[in-house]
Amino acid sequence: MATIQEIECDFLAKIAQKFTNAEIELINKAFYHAKTWHENQKRLSGEPFFIHPLRTALSLVEWNMDPITICAGLLHDIIEDTDQTEANIAMIFSKEIAELVTKVTKITNESKKQRHLKNKKENLNLKSFVNIAINSQQEINVMVLKLADRLDNIASIEFLPIEKQKVIAKETLELYAKIAGRIGMYPVKTKLADLSFKVLDLKNYDNTLSKINKQKVFYDNEWDNFKQQLKKILAQNQIEYQLESRIKGIYSTYKKLTVHEQNISKIHDLFAIRLITKSELDCYHILGLIHLNFLIDSKYFKDYIASPKQNLYQSIHTTVRLKGLNVEIQIRTQQMDNVSKFGLASHWIYKEQKEGLLAPALQLNYLVTKQKHSHDFLKRIFGTDIIKINVSASHEPNVIKQINVDSNNKLLDIAFENYPKQFAKLTKIEIDGVEINSFDTSVENEMLIEFYFGKNNNLKSKWIRYMNNPIYREKVKKSLAKLAKSGRYSELAFYEKELGEKQLKLASETEIQKRLNTLRIKKMSDYLALIECTNFTNDEHLLFLAKNNDKWNKLTKPLKFAFSKVVFHNSYFEQIEGIFITKIVIEPCCSKIPDMPEQVTGILTKNILSVHRYGCKNLQNKKQLKIIPLYWNIQQLKLKPRKFRSYININGVWSEKTINKICQTIINGDGYIEKIIPKINKQKDEFDLNITLFVNNYQQLLTLMDQITTKNISFSWKYL
């Protein structure tokens, strides 16, 4: 590690390159005051304490933060660790710097308080303290400053007791790494996650690092050859660019390995190349050359230029398939690259003006300009709301845990997270003292949730559908697979037991399949999936499986209509009486959105209802098929709002910023762009744009098109 003298030289040299004389004078003032106030303090490593705020401030300089935030970085431990007060800092520097230092101190103190809770293992929910500490109009730079502080602390954590290391590492991984990702600071997120992972699980850290290194050695020649090919193609087309290589982070790779059964070759973005070029047009030119010259895995293609992420990240991602190796290519401009590395921090560009005004990133920096309140801020950061619930379990009488969770959690997510060892034995859940009928329930604020566990394994495959957490779902799948392999789990056995309680036996597999054929159902698993979500009053679903039941065929009609009713109920269409369907498929061939003028229709084929627009080309010359008019279910659209795919063609007069304006207007209007195919004729100044986008309904689509007309763009449009 560098000495404090080396870091001081580096820091002073970098601020000299970036700032005006007046700004340098302010930063130097903070530098020397912080050094003086921390003069007699030491870290556990024996180093001068000042090395920590100095490294924190150096990170802020490298992340392009403004002088106010850099000064606060130098002073961020002053209130906590010296006798200086907020008033003193405000008097010597400014009120703005003093408030920043106070805000960061608040977060630090709340974090420490959470760590010292008596039941910290149960109660340490790391999102909650931010919700408490940032309780009034705060800005993104507070969190950026805190990220710089935490990055240095986690990088030098080895001098703390092991248990304290683990608590801080857990906090860093679950909160700070996530915040860094949400505001677009991906390199910082990777560093925080990897350093935390090393503390929390050194064995898996080393194992994952070893696998990555083996891949690097094994594919070294293939990797180098590909880069040379790429450089040659770009040189032949006279494209200016910078090429950067990266290997996926250790923790991120570990998480992917858990999904891909420890097979590292299945990770498509382990190796990546960044191509940084001058303009958006060059980005798409490079994309075309790559797709023309290499084999592409299309399922990983993402156009974040046309449809930026909420944290402003923009780039085109495409994956090249080489011999035994996948390489992700990221194509972006220099400005996009700055955002990808520093996220919203990249927008604290300090203008060289006499008055020294900060220049936040115009309308783009909506997290600062629009989301001032901490509740909204956290909702943006975590992509969901944070709610408080109370949980208890039958095996822990008189123990109630108060925890904070994302609002998109379901009951089984909570059960698995808090009681993983007992999860498979879950038999009953009560909410506020009342037993619920279905485990497929989301959590709500202030709920009291009581979990009841039995002695025997009660795990069911349908529970997977009742969970939102993909990691937990994957673990349940693996548990079911193990049980099935050992012969200790079978859903048929569950229904056989229910029949036994009625003094009936299960029919043979051959007989059951014969009966399923009458329902046009091929697999027993499909039948079980259907009856799981169907309410029967007279046990028709069980009697249908019973041995020596001559009346089973009389049950087919009520079963068919019951199944059809459930399928329609779970769709966005009104029920059509008198038909039997097992599935509704909204086909991707044409635009079908609520409220559109054209009739939506369904083609019934082998009990599957395929949904098309009346004018769809796939319906032409198919009069022999059974075509059924469909009607949107207004109530379902209100209860379960979602976006629907629409294909739009836009053509008109082209200019350099036309396509970008169109895409930005759609995004700002809450449309989601999935794919964009532009054709530009510069000689005629014309463009033709095919866009696949998702909207709520036809009215939203019309509104988006109207908004585009306000951007001084001459165009016409139609849906396909």
Swiss-Prot record:
Pathway it works in: Purine metabolism; ppGpp biosynthesis; ppGpp from GDP: step 1/1
This protein is called: Probable guanosine-3',5'-bis(diphosphate) 3'-pyrophosphohydrolase
Q: Output the superkingdom of the source species.
A: Bacteria
The prosthetic group or cofactor this protein requires is: Mn(2+)
Residues of the signal peptide = none
HD domain mapped to chain residues = 49-154
* One annotated GO biological process: guanosine tetraphosphate biosynthetic process
